Amino acid sequence: MPYKPINDEKHNDLPSFIHQAALDPHLNLDALNQICDACIHFNFSGLCTTLNKLSPAKKRLGQNKKTKLIAVIAFPFGDIPSAIKKKEAEWAAEHGAEELDVVPNFLNLYEGAIEDFAEEISKISSIGLPSRVILDTMRLPKEKLALAIEACIDAGAQGIQTGNGFGFAANQTHIRELRSLIKNRCAIKAAGGIKSLMQALELINSGATSIGTSYGVDITKESKNHLKQK
């Protein structure tokens, strides 16, 4: 999937890259509603949330077509049985999710059970929703990362996400490495520690096709202020 760089004259495109995160377990409904309203106001391309918040988020987003409702599956560590993981994905599909961000079974990857690793992803892909696999890419050895990417693409994943937000911040160097391994065959979602406009633009211009962040509103306001000063 080709990426589309943003230059200084195209900040208005920025919201189409933003997947606003609503993953804090302490988030109350008032705060969730405010996030949903911001997604509608700024035309963010996605709202990423937990299974428990899918239904209220779907209700608040209403008929808005620009913001896709994204559910995280087996988040944040993926360390649950595959059958339960698939049940989570099916439940998400039944309760309004339009896309899935899935944490895979890293034990299978490290122990060389690559067929089992891929089969889990394939079963979730078969549900029919576009899915990204959260690979925690900055922690994986390069050979395991390359192997995982091939398995994910072969299993039907439509994107790779850099991390779950608990590790290292996404950076330009790693996005470029992912881009070289993926070779335009699927999307790249950068996530983790993205708090500023400069970070977001650097990641997009390095090859990220979406930006997962809890700071979508701040980043977009920073972009709009930048345009006003031009």
Regions found by a protein language model. Give the residues of each.
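Conserved, mostly hydrophobic/aromatic
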Residues: 19, 57, 92, 133, ...
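Glycine-rich phosphate-binding active-site loops on the catalytic face of alpha/beta enzymes
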Residues: 21, 71-75, 79, 94-109, ...
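Conserved anion-binding
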Residues: 78, 84-93, 99-159
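Catalytic cores of alpha/beta
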Residues: 79-91, 140-152, 175-190, 194-211
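Alpha-helix-loop-beta-strand connector modules within alpha/beta enzyme cores
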Residues: 51, 55-75, 114-139, 169-196, ...
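Glycine-rich, proline-tolerant flexible connector loops at the mouths of alpha/beta enzymes
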Residues: 36, 40-56, 75, 100-118, ...
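Conserved N-terminal beta1-alpha1 strand-loop-helix module at the mouth
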Residues: 1-95, 142, 147, 151-154
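Structural preference for beta-strand elements that scaffold enzyme active sites
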Residues: 15-17, 45-46, 66-70, 98-101, ...
